[in-house]
Amino acid sequence: MQAVSVVLYLLLAPFAGALLDGMDRKISARMQGRQGPPLLQPFYDLAKLFSKQMLAVNNVQIFLLLSYLIFLAVSGSLLFAGADILMCLFILSTADMFLVMAASSDSSPFSTLGAGREMIQIMAYEPMTLLLAVGFYLATGSFQVADIIRQPVSAVVAMPGFLLGMMFTMAIKLRKSPFDLSTSHHAHQEIVKGLTTEMAGPALAVMNIAEYYEVTLMLGLVALFFLNSDPLSWPVAIIACLVVYFLEILWDNVSARVKWKALLDSCWVVTLLTGGLNGLILMLIR
């Protein structure tokens, strides 16, 4: 069963991520009074990127981007296989470093600046990422995803603060406003694309596929809050994921980009007040 879950994740996660990206573009366009692209536009974009000639800035960049993709795929595979969530999050953090190195491997000042901003974003959300694994252990007594989803009561009952912190840091992780410092998904915000400035053709396609794996992984972590031994918790978890993703899109469209100091301060304060306080309460009542 674990092998089936891993294979399904590896095959279906990019398609699910691309559909969510298409939904993001469509909803964002309607919020801005535009018609927007078709729902399948991300698939058309990938096909066009792969059809272009491979023009990487250097041979190292494509290797680092492939490493970024592979580590994200491995991290998600561990989550959907029911393995150790702590190991899953450690590998996820390692994947981020490959992206920073890929952006830093060329001489473009815009790409280098984007890589530096990405490092700041990692510093901002990483404490919440580690606290998340600790929170699941305090609430369920196990780091194993398979044990967490077999609990009689959903983890969100004991971890509402962690869920709020997760939703906050998810906006940073997915590089959505107001925390899209390293690169932007919207053309009206930034012509120069930060850490993806020198990525084009198949290299940019690999970057996009990696992001589709990442968004699926992040929503999988959201679903983990709502899953339990009751089969009815699965549709509830799916609905919760869609609601959370819609809230991220809404926040993305009503917010202006903040400066890096505001990013660090706000994220660390939210981490302390949500994950830190919730974790302290769980430690006291154990």
Can you annotate each of these PLM segments?
Residues 1-286:
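Alpha-helical transmembrane segments of multi-pass membrane proteins predominantly involved
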